Amino acid sequence: MSTNAMNRLAALFVALSVLGVGAAALYRFSQQPKFQLKRVDVRGDLRHVTALSVRSALVGRLRGNYFTMRLDDTRRLFETVPWVAAASVRRVWPDRLLVTLTEHRALGVWEDGRLLSDRGELFVANPDEAEIYGRLPVFSGPFSAAKDAARRYYELSAQFAPLSLHITEVDISDRKAWSLRLVPSNHEGARPSEGLVVELGRDRAELPLTERVAQVVAAYPLVIAQIGAAPVRIDARYANGLAVSTMAKPMKSERPVRP
């Protein structure tokens, strides 16, 4: 082996030794007791998340210290807390975590007992804790329809507002056909079988749901004037008219919601 090669090899060994010593020193430094997490500060506009619920979800599960904690894993851990929609986590020197939480806002109850957020996400939480939002509408249908259900709910609610009708049930079939149950806004405590059922069918380019609802809203006062009472069912699946019934027929979502 040439002298130059031996010199390069010796320099490499020296460099590796220095790196090894440095890494060992850094490891010993990072393991000092003063870097063990001693405090977790939680912030956010929180109405449901409590210190107890956070502690119950995280006890014995936080791993690492200021240097070794994996922030992505920790963030996902906080997002398992009931009502938490999103979390951000950052370190605060030398022994703290600052966690900012965003809560779900409940829009309704899905037929399987989970809550539907206003962003169309299904999540597990105690439905009784959602009472601060008032009586929640019940949604039924394939889980893949959740995002569309939330978005459409706001659109359709705004359309029915001039009639002072409030949506209490939304049913989406496997074929994506829509049915709604509505009650007068001052009778939101009505029994599940009461109110007006509106069959809208599928959302089609040539006859969108919003257009069909507009037809119902325009015709509703005329229907009441003609039959002398509020109808219990309106079938708006037709392109050129509405079918009105005064005989009630159960909706799929009238089945008991599973806990």
Q: What name fits each language-model region?
A:
Residues 81:
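Acidic-histidine catalytic/liganding microenvironments
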Residues 42:
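Extended, alpha-helix-rich binding/interface surfaces that flank or overlap catalytic cores
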Residues 1-39, 49-65, 69-76, 87-88, ...:
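Charged, solvent-exposed interaction patches on well-folded alpha/beta domains
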